[in-house]
Amino acid sequence: MDSRKLSPRGKKLESHLSQEHRRPPLGLIAAWGQPSIQSSVQQGLQTQDWVCEPPERRRPGRRWSVSIDERRRLATLGGRERPGAAGTQLHCRDVVQMVAQLVSEDVDKDVLLPHPLRSTESTNAFQAFLARSAPFWHNATFEASRSPPS
């Protein structure tokens, strides 16, 4: 027989260990990154509020976690503000689309964009677009100067 089960002191130790080192149900193990196992067990299988980096991929000294609200915000943005190479390509594509829309609406080329997100990339994309559309600007300016105001 185990001596811990017989003595009152052992019962306290056993109950303390069982509370701290309790194994969560399989569903909770699969949903790693919960704020605490004990609170997750009490809440049952509810929506996970935080997503954390899996321990097997974590490098020493590096941790990240994203709240579910932040995940929703990023999802509604469609990836436009996500950092990295893909975000850079999306950003440049957005700038080109905004400039193309301004051109199609006969907006003057000197109009400033409302919120330049990355000045160097925005400037380069805008300048490249202007270089490609120089004949259009020349024709539009020439036609505007020829036609009388209505």
UniProtKB/Swiss-Prot annotation:
Residues 1-23 have a biased composition (Basic and acidic residues). One of its GO terms (cellular component) is acrosomal vesicle. Signal peptide: none annotated. It is found in: Cytoplasm; Cytoplasmic vesicle, Secretory vesicle, Acrosome. It comes from the Eukaryota. The keyword Methyltransferase does not apply. Keywords: Cytoplasm, Cytoplasmic vesicle. Residues 1-26 are annotated as: Disordered. This is Testis-expressed protein 22. It comes from Homo sapiens. The gene is TEX22.
